[in-house]
């Protein structure tokens, strides 16, 4: 895979030996610069990737370089080699671990795919009415924290100050969350043997759904390589682990955001690129048609409303993401302006819809957002279409049911 632009290698010393392997992998040319000239070189060289050796002399130049890189478009990956301290928000950590070039090549290729995806979205945006979400992707990210050691509570708080957190005290619980949620990273903390850690990482590497997922291990030395391009060992205090894991998490969240935006473009702008569900306008149109057709042809139609604390907008977004992943292809829904999420279950009676809504609600309750541990506990109301209903009357009854349930 060749990239549209050179690789800018920033260092005050000699090139590490494993950098030569980039040529063999068709990741070239590599342009060298020192730290004092790095920010200017970004403008002049227009690189596709910035690779920086954190081997000394970088301290006064790191923040200006990170800011310059963040200003570039499309996305410019910034990989920091063997960083000892806390990194800027857009610097992807990479520990060379004895010069394993295969890991670096896989990391760069994964980042370059996201750069290409961003360029594709930017190219297609002018043709549509879709806009990229303006929020920092990290604000919408959700991370699975797996662990049961003494550092688990502090790590949960440190991550929770930056992203949404789903906690798991066992590998079995972690596997369940991996299968039911859209996650932007996994942090594997202490509390498991090296053998269990190895088995968990092996399973992740063998499943194509999780291969690009950032995986941060905090407690064990990694004795072998895994087919996980974004696997990183980050030991240390919880605050440092969270800060240095965040760039990898943000990159994955951005990739997911770009993928949803591309699907929205393909759907003519009727999908919300932030939630993955229909826009409010598209939902109103499709719901009116579904009610009309069900009344004319017969059959069942049920609706569920998941209402959240208006002060916890993140809970609504998490619920929308869960629903977009788990609901059937024939169902549809939208995040509403009042903070709720409404889902329509086609060809479904009240009893079945109530059972589905209860299961979906149980999945939503496992996320905490922010340092105050606000949890996603929805107030759920379910109703079904009757022969005398219109789309408006059914939604009105659903909202009234929710108000009574909340009072």
Question: Which residue stretches match the model-derived regions?
Answer:
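Amphipathic HAMP/coiled-coil signal-transducing linker helices
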Residues: 260-282
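Short regulatory alpha-helical coupling segments
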Residues: 278-299, 318-328
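Conserved phosphotransfer microenvironments
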Residues: 15, 33-39, 48-75, 83-84, ...
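Two-component/phosphorelay signaling modules centered on CheY-like receiver
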Residues: 9-31, 148-171
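Conserved helix-loop-beta segment at the catalytic/binding core of cyclic-nucleotide signaling proteins
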Residues: 270, 318-353, 362, 366-373
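Catalytic-core segments of nucleotide cyclases and related cyclic-nucleotide turnover enzymes
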Residues: 350-361, 377, 383-407
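Receiver (REC) domain switch/output surface
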Residues: 90-91, 98-129, 238-264, 286, ...
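Active-site-flanking beta-strand signature of metal-NTP-handling nucleotidyl enzymes
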Residues: 142-143, 273, 277, 299-310, ...
